Amino acid sequence: MKYSKIPVARSVVALCVAKDIKHVVISPGSRNAPLTIGFTHHDEITPYSIVDERCAAFFALGLAQELKKPVALVCTSGSALLNYYPAIAEAYYSDIPLVIISADRPIERIDIGDGQTIRQKNVFENHILYSANLYSELVLENQSQDPKLQQKQFEAQKHNEREVNLALNKAIEEKGPVHINVPFYEPLYDTVENINVNPLQIFPEIKERHYSEKQLQNYANEWNRAERKMVIVGVAQPNAVEQKFLEGLATDPSVIVLTETTSNLHQEQFFTRIDTLIGPIEKDENREELFNRLQPDILLTFGGMIVSKKIKSFLRNYSPQHHWHIDSKKAYNTFFCLNKHFETDVNSFFSEFFPLTKRTESDYGSFWKDIKGKRQHRHEDYMAEIPYSDLKAMQEIYQKIPKNSVLHFGNSSTIRYAQLFEWDKSLKIYCNRGTSGIDGSVSTAVGASVSSEEPVTIITGDLSFFYDSNALWNNYIPSNFRIIILNNNGGGIFRILPGNKNSENFEKYFETTHNLKAKPICDLYNFDYEKANSEEEIQKVMKDFYSESGKPKLLEIFTPRKINDEVLLEYFNFMKS
């Protein structure tokens, strides 16, 4: 095996391997050659080569999300590093561990006019868990050199080893992005046959906080007194909560549990479609009475970001007396009423809290569960009669997604349409809701498909797909990967939002209408291409869309541009009856 002659490069590789960080996504460059040589020649590393750094970073994010362990990114100096930023922000807000390793020039070469050089030190400081800024190391050919120089080299090496340890441990312990900036002197391509470093290892400490009965008793008393308790679950990994706790919540008549498509939690009594519950009340002449009846005494939340704007608006206007959030790292005051953060994981909290609670008699659960059942019937009636549109196309897709597969959604219309359906509980569902951007949804799904044991599908809008079409520019996409595009010739989400829709400025600067089609991209990247222009054509194509194939497939569904907002808004009017 070959490794860089530069000791710090060998130490970075050795420590990544020691901490089980063995998937490394590399973008080509020269300054990062010492790292690339080491990672690509190590037999325990799985390297990936992806040219576009923005796509590479989201690819790594999808890998890490699926593997549930850190993935490393390696790039050259200069603006290459900045292209990682959108994915780093997503990882930061979604608690996904990424290790960004950037090559740099020595500090004395910064801001003197050297090429491909920017200020890389702490460049991500607002959205990073840890920034490790390493020292440059000289390659000492002759051990009899000046002892002062050798001492300086020794101190630099110890500093570097400590910083790399701290960064990697932070990614492992707290599940988020970290940045290691490694400046290199030339020559960059000299190699040695053995890794020949034994860096200091500082082992990560996974800290678990536990609450005593004394600490929880007052909260348990409040819980037991409350006749209206609402639990909301944001983004979560599949099987994140033990089933016995879900059943305990479901059987308490004073509790209703609201989940989202990305919550990956399933229990028959839960409200899986928040907007179908809230949206019709907004249109109801008795909305004040109904919202007062829905207003909880206690709001308990866990999981990541919430998609539904309707639940945010409701709880900001009808605040609970208490809002408690469970998360080992952070608690966002999403509803403007947070008054307790339980800094622990959900299962630990429930195991300590539930023994102190009791069943509370109330009609809160039964009242809203009755409405839930009625809404389901209205949903079925409405879907049976609507014209061909984005919503109708989503219904056809919903009915054909194979069980036991992984499903990704793009931002922003597709995930909001998805929220109106009750997806099969065997599916693992993801969407980049940390920052809710359109910039990396396809790349994330591609990364997930590489490491997933189940087939992966992404359902996305046209703008989100075309924005991230470089996601297909790599050699790792499996043949069972599927892309479904809802192409309504622009940003259809803006037709749903307030504003004047009948102006040239709206179409040009908000909706950004276009006539692009995905077939040329499929030809370029060797995807099978299918298209559909009607409900019947979708049904026909979907029959064989998931059949075994020699290459990945893309289905482009063309939908009307101007009818979708009317169909969606009328959905909530129809549901209130």
UniProtKB/Swiss-Prot annotation:
It comes from the Bacteria. Homodimer. Keywords: Magnesium, Manganese, Menaquinone biosynthesis, Metal-binding, Thiamine pyrophosphate, Transferase. GO terms for biological process: menaquinone biosynthetic process. Its cofactor is Mg(2+); Mn(2+); thiamine diphosphate. SUPFAM superfamilies: Thiamin diphosphate-binding fold (THDP-binding). One of its GO terms (molecular function) is thiamine pyrophosphate binding. This is 2-succinyl-5-enolpyruvyl-6-hydroxy-3-cyclohexene-1-carboxylate synthase. The lineage of its organism: Bacteria, Pseudomonadati, Bacteroidota, Flavobacteriia, Flavobacteriales. PANTHER family: 2-SUCCINYL-5-ENOLPYRUVYL-6-HYDROXY-3-CYCLOHEXENE-1-CARBOXYLATE SYNTHASE, PROTEIN PHYLLO, CHLOROPLASTIC. InterPro entries: MenaQ_synth_MenD, MenD_middle, THDP-binding, Thiamin_PyroP_enz_TPP-bd_dom, TPP_enzyme_TPP-bd. Binds 1 thiamine pyrophosphate per subunit. It catalyses: isochorismate + 2-oxoglutarate + H(+) = 5-enolpyruvoyl-6-hydroxy-2-succinyl-cyclohex-3-ene-1-carboxylate + CO2. Belongs to the TPP enzyme family. MenD subfamily. Gene3D superfamilies: 3.40.50.970, TPP-binding domain (3.40.50.1220). Its EC number is 2.2.1.9. Pathway: Quinol/quinone metabolism; 1,4-dihydroxy-2-naphthoate biosynthesis; 1,4-dihydroxy-2-naphthoate from chorismate: step 2/7; Quinol/quinone metabolism; menaquinone biosynthesis. The keyword Protein biosynthesis does not apply. Catalyzes the thiamine diphosphate-dependent decarboxylation of 2-oxoglutarate and the subsequent addition of the resulting succinic semialdehyde-thiamine pyrophosphate anion to isochorismate to yield 2-succinyl-5-enolpyruvyl-6-hydroxy-3-cyclohexene-1-carboxylate (SEPHCHC).
